[in-house]
Every structure is written in structure tokens, then in C-alpha cells.
């Protein structure tokens, strides 16, 4: 009787193994969930560097007065005076 049973199990091993593995996995999963208990509340995620940078830039923009701008005469002088006028005594 045992040799016949082992021959049948060996022949149909793929069909027997999958349901057994499925049942063992399901029981283990639920047993672990039962032992572990209720999941803790997820911790608050830390902001990414780009999000912190955007927040900082928005805070800087809120603190500025956008009606006060630099005059166009000051903007035309785009290079430092010390570099270009070093050898021109008439402009100093």
C-alpha cells in the first residue's frame, strides 16, 4: 500500500505541492498577523530637500516688498567696477 501511495504522490507532486504550500503560507501569514497585532500608526514622513527648499523660497518671497525694485541705472552696470575700471583713472 505504501509503495502505491508514494508512486501516486510522486506522479502528482506538482498538483499536491501547490495547495499544501498555499495552505501553509496562508496559515503562517494569518498567524503572524495575529501575533503581531494591530499595525502602529505610520510615522509622519520627513519633507524632501526640494520641498524644504521650495518652502524656504516661498517664505523669503512673502517677506519681501515687491514694489521696491532696483533702478535700471544700477542694473546696467553688470560688471564689478573694480575689475574693469582698474586701469582707467578717469572713471575712478
From Swiss-Prot:
Membrane-topology annotation of the record: Single-pass membrane protein
UniProt keyword list: Membrane, Transmembrane, Transmembrane helix
Protein's cellular compartments: Membrane
Assigned GO CC terms: membrane
KW Membrane (keyword) present: yes
Recorded superkingdom: Eukaryota
TM ranges: 15-34
Family label: Belongs to the SMIM12 family.
Protein's recorded name: Small integral membrane protein 12
Source species taxonomy: Eukaryota, Metazoa, Chordata, Craniata, Vertebrata
Gene: SMIM12
Amino acid at each position: 500500500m505504501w509503495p502505491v501511495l508514494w508512486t501516486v504522490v510522486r506522479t502528482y507532486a506538482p498538483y499536491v505541492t501547490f495547495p499544501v504550500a498555499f495552505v501553509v503560507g496562508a496559515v503562517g501569514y494569518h498567524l503572524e498577523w495575529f501575533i503581531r497585532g494591530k499595525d502602529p500608526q505610520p510615522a509622519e514622513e520627513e519633507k524632501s530637500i526640494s520641498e524644504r527648499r521650495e518652502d524656504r523660497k516661498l517664505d523669503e518671497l512673502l517677506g519681501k516688498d515687491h514694489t521696491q525694485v532696483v533702478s535700471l541705472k544700477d542694473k546696467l552696470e553688470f560688471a564689478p567696477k573694480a575689475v574693469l575700471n582698474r586701469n582707467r583713472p578717469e572713471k575712478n
